[in-house]
Regions:
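A structural feature that tracks compact, well-ordered secondary-structure segments
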Residues: 10, 69-71, 141-145
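Short, basic, helix/turn surface patches
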Residues: 58-65, 140-147
Length: 147
């Protein structure tokens, strides 16, 4: 397996609007697209449960994106915020490997299943966060573009 450049940063925040304001006014990063993708995420099977409750803001840079995530209900993001506080949650790397290859390789390294695995209602994979927290200090987002 070979990972390339970082193409996505997922950051958990307590207050989405306040975080966006800091990025825009003090860091010069913007504009942001703010969304409340609740309906979309509620339909998913997320690590054996139903949906995710979040609000999100996206910045699309030159070859990378930053996602700010504000948890609005119980789930993995709220758990993260309570346990670790706001900050970097996950990274996504450019790769030519398939979704399954990356998931399998990360499981072989850690001995653990993904921290999160979101699937469409029909069971097809959408996204996973490989848990390499102990081994490499990070969660790796793995997107599935396979039909």
């Amino acid at each position: 397996m070979k990972m390339g450049k970082i193409i996505h940063l997922g950051i958990v925040v307590e207050d989405l609007e306040s975080a966006v304001k800091v990025y825009e006014e003090h860091l010069g990063i913007g504009p942001w697209e703010i969304s409340c993708p609740g309906e979309f995420f509620r339909q998913l099977d997320v690590t054996g449960g139903r949906g995710l409750e979040i609000r999100a803001a996206m910045f699309f840079g030159d070859g990378y994106e930053i996602e700010l995530i504000e948890p609005t209900g119980e789930g993995i993001y709220m758990d993260w915020l309570r346990e670790k506080g706001p900050g970097l949650h996950h990274l996504k790397f450019e790769t030519k490997n398939s979704y399954r290859e990356v998931v399998d390789e990360c499981e072989a390294v850690s001995g653990r299943p993904p921290y999160l695995e979101a699937k469409w209602p029909d069971g097809r994979p959408l996204v996973a966060y490989a848990d390499l927290l102990k081994e490499a200090g990070l969660l790796i987002e793995i997107g599935c573009n396979e039909k």
